[in-house]
């Protein structure tokens, strides 16, 4: 008979047991469930709610079970439904009637809320560390490439010259914000719900603050309905994970393009590429492509939980059992993605000569040419028009701006002088952009220094 089966006259159908059971996936919460139960039993004994001798037996029994879980010695059972009932059943089998007192003042509703909050805190912490590792890799690459000229793009068209360091620091800022989002998700999860009961608290004099202290929570929930009814803290994790995967996917898209023969900006390390079963010459950026593909999977996990929660009346509903698989899948996908991406990034070879050559084409210095005229007193809109005409002329003549003679330039506007040629070199175009956040090497160095301080 089920632990809750007192009011039922027959056992649940086997089909229901199979459909209803969550032990296949919530066994992942075993350590959190047992640790939470140890804290709960400790508090019950301290408060005199159950005999201290029974509390001691429960704690000792749970610690033995926890050790067996870590050693892989436990077999979970579908007919016990979930991790909570599996642990309680096993405990009672091992220590006898004292185990029946464990659930005093507690419901599975607040118990599972506790478990997933504890797991979410761990997930946020590990993700934060992985992002820190990625941020350090970006800083290292940026530091080594302060003067590596490359084209910046808009609409995937060459736009203006920048540096590889500046490009890496753009992603640094994105992933730094991602880390901040996981820190915020941690704070949302760091609220202890035990004591909420099924929905209306309990008549027992529980010391909720003591349980929070034992489990390392900074505060307790302030409303028993809210304590069991919401999973917004998981949605915050899933949202942060989705945004982080989006940033990874964008980065991977660029690396995929850059590794192609059309760009040839990077060479993927052999350890992070694959071949073709039919084409002997192929070296495919499969790792980057898989991360890009798995991003949609994490989006799906977010939408799964949003959809589960959107129509639920207060308080707990069985629909909420569906939170865990989406959460676990997103966590696993993100962890694997961050781990392999950071390792891959550190092995990439950047072809600096190809990047520099690419920057010199496509009239990336056209804006600087217009700015040159502005410094000579020409209104910007007039300068813009003149340089546009110059570009059209160059296209007709198959020339770059720096290929034009001074006489040719002056035929478009008399403000051009001999110093224009120094101003239009790729390095000069970059070095003149010396406001905070711009690509001039000394400005990027300031960003790198600030980034290291932020870590």
For the regions a language model picked out, list residue spans one by one.
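Conserved hydrophobic residue
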Residues: 49-50, 74, 263-264, 379, ...
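Glycine-rich cofactor/substrate-binding loops
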Residues: 1-36, 97-98, 279-455
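A helix-coil-helix interface module used to build multimeric assemblies
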Residues: 1-201, 206-208, 212, 274-275, ...
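Short runs of predominantly hydrophobic/aromatic residues within well-ordered alpha helices
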Residues: 37, 84, 88, 234-237, ...
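Charged, flexible cofactor/metal-binding loops and thiol motifs
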Residues: 116-117, 121-124, 128, 143, ...
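Short, well-ordered beta-strand elements within core beta-sheets of diverse protein domains
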Residues: 42-50, 119, 166, 235-243, ...
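Generic, well-ordered alpha-helical scaffold segments in large soluble proteins
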Residues: 40, 61-68, 90, 94, ...
């Amino acid at each position: 008979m089920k632990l809750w089966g007192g009011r039922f006259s027959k056992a649940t159908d086997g089909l229901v047991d199979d459909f209803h059971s969550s032990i296949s996936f919530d066994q992942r919460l075993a350590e959190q469930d047992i640790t939470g139960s140890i804290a709960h039993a400790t508090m019950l004994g301290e408060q005199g709610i159950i005999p201290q001798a029974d509390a001691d037996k429960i704690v000792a029994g749970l610690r033995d079970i926890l050790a067996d879980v870590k050693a892989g010695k436990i077999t979970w059972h579908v007919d016990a439904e979930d991790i909570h009932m599996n642990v309680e059943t096993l405990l009672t089998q091992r220590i006898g009637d004292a185990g029946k007192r464990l659930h005093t003042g507690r419901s599975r509703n607040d118990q599972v809320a506790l478990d997933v909050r504890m797991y979410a805190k761990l997930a946020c912490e590990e993700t934060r560390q992985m992002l820190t590792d990625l941020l350090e890799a970006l800083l290292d690459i940026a530091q080594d490439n302060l003067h590596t000229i490359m084209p910046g793009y808009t609409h995937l068209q060459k736009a203006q010259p920048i540096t590889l360091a500046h490009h890496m620091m753009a992603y640094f800022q994105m992933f730094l914000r991602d880390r901040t989002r996981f820190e915020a998700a941690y704070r949302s999860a760091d609220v202890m719900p035990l004591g909420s009961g099924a929905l209306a608290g309990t008549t027992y004099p529980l010391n909720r603050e003591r349980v929070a202290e034992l489990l390392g929570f900074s505060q307790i929930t302030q409303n028993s309905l809210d304590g069991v009814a919401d999973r917004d803290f998981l949605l915050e994790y899933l949202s942060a994970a989705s945004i982080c995967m989006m940033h990874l996917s964008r980065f991977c898209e660029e690396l995929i393009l850059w590794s192609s023969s059309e760009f040839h900006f990077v060479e993927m390390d052999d350890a992070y590429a694959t071949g073709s079963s039919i084409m002997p010459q192929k070296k495919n950026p499969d790792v980057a492509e898989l991360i890009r593909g798995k991003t949609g999977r994490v989006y799906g996990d977010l939408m799964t939980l949003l959809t589960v929660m959107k129509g639920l009346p207060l308080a707990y509903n069985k629909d909420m059992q569906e939170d865990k698989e989406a959460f676990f899948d997103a966590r696993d996908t993100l962890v694997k993605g961050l781990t392999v991406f950071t390792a891959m990034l550190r092995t990439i070879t950047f072809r600096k000569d190809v990047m520099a050559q690419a920057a010199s084409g496509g009239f990336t210095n056209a804006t600087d040419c217009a700015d040159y005229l502005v410094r000579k007193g020409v209104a910007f809109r007039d300068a813009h028009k003149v340089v546009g005409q110059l570009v059209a002329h160059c296209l007709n003549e198959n020339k770059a701006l720096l290929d034009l003679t001074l006489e040719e330039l002056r035929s478009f506007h008399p403000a051009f002088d001999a110093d224009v040629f120094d101003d239009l070199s790729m390095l000069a175009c970059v070095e003149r952009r010396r406001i905070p956040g711009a690509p001039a090497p000394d400005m990027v160095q300031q960003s790198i220094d600030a980034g290291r301080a932020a870590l």
